[in-house]
From Swiss-Prot:
Membership in a protein family: Belongs to the frog skin active peptide (FSAP) family. Brevinin subfamily.
Protein name: Brevinin-1Sa
Keywords associated with the record: Amphibian defense peptide, Antibiotic, Antimicrobial, Disulfide bond, Secreted
GO biological process terms on file: defense response to bacterium
Tissue specificity: Expressed by the skin glands.
Disulfide links within the chain: C18-C24
Organism: Lithobates sphenocephalus (Southern leopard frog)
Amino acid sequence: FLPAIVGAAGQFLPKIFCAISKKC
């Protein structure tokens, strides 16, 4: 359960951070 959340966050969070910070 937890590894799945960590894996999804690992893929999703960088994209959000990239969009917010405009550093891609």
